[in-house]
Amino acid sequence: MRPKISIIGAGFVGSTAAHWIASKELGDVVLVDIIEGVPQGKGLDLLQAGPIEGFDVKITGTNDYSATAGSDIIVVTSGAPRKPGMSREDLIRVNADITRDCISKAAPLSPNAIIIMVNNPLDTMTYLAKQVSGFPKNRVVGQAGVLDTARYRTFIAMEAGVSVEDIQAMLMGGHGDEMVPLPRFTTISGIPVTEFISKERLDAIVDRTRKGGGEIVNLLKTGSAYYAPSAATVQMVEAILRDKKRVLPCSCYLEGEYGLNDIYFGVPCVLGAGGVERVLELPLNDEEMALVKKSAEAVSSSIAALKAM
């Protein structure tokens, strides 16, 4: 029997993720959305691409959560984007309501699933998903660092004039302006990145990475990134379903790692069939640790705002 992946939210990120999951034949896909006709139409459209692209999986579009029963993975992409004039608290309130609704309906139907959160504010919504689902910490994880690291690697490859395939990089922290790219742990085919790029240019790349999502929002005018976010999500899905033990930066629940507690935070982890199989603690220097602490304060503040609601 093929694995079953349920994607909650049939917007750009959800439907693009469904496409890549199907094309990689990672499993059968259930696409869920509250808008009648949208998941059904996108699901049917995607199914009809199968004969052309050469994939053969079952794709179901639905407004009914019962179709998600027995899922191996639940991906939550549904959420409202931050609009002009909207405070961080406003965004938390709106998306917390959506997340509670999605998780309370999907989790009981798939008690052994692994949940991958993709909606924003990412670390806070992942924290909420763990609370609402009651799942153990290893089976609730947030997708942020894979995307942020991909942006970082892309900018480094552009600057160095080399293949993006040869950039190895790590990034930590909350998904936002306080993320912590780690140049000291960045190499080009094992060669320190500082052999290719000056500190000044590297600092500029780090800054651009932090603002990576906003840069695309500003260019699009309406909407936000979806190709890279969905690709990042599918990389995590594949790592879990194929038990690849990938070392990826993900939003994980911490209990003492890096001196942090009761927080979802972007850290390197081993991702496999058990979900987050272990968190890796890097030997950070004082400067890096200070940036991590600052980032953690921003995430903790967001989680505190959630708890106060």
Swiss-Prot record:
Gene3D superfamilies: Lactate dehydrogenase/glycoside hydrolase, family 4, C-terminal (3.90.110.10), NAD(P)-binding Rossmann-like Domain (3.40.50.720). Its EC number is 1.1.1.37. One of its GO terms (biological process) is tricarboxylic acid cycle. Coiled coil: none annotated. Keywords: NAD, Oxidoreductase, Tricarboxylic acid cycle. Disulfide bonds: none annotated. The active site is at 175 (proton acceptor). Substrate binds at residues 82, 88, 120, 151. NAD(+) binds at residues 9-14, 33, 95, 118-120. It catalyses: (S)-malate + NAD(+) = oxaloacetate + NADH + H(+). Catalyzes the reversible oxidation of malate to oxaloacetate. Belongs to the LDH/MDH superfamily. MDH type 3 family. This is Malate dehydrogenase. It comes from Roseiflexus sp. (strain RS-1). The gene is mdh.
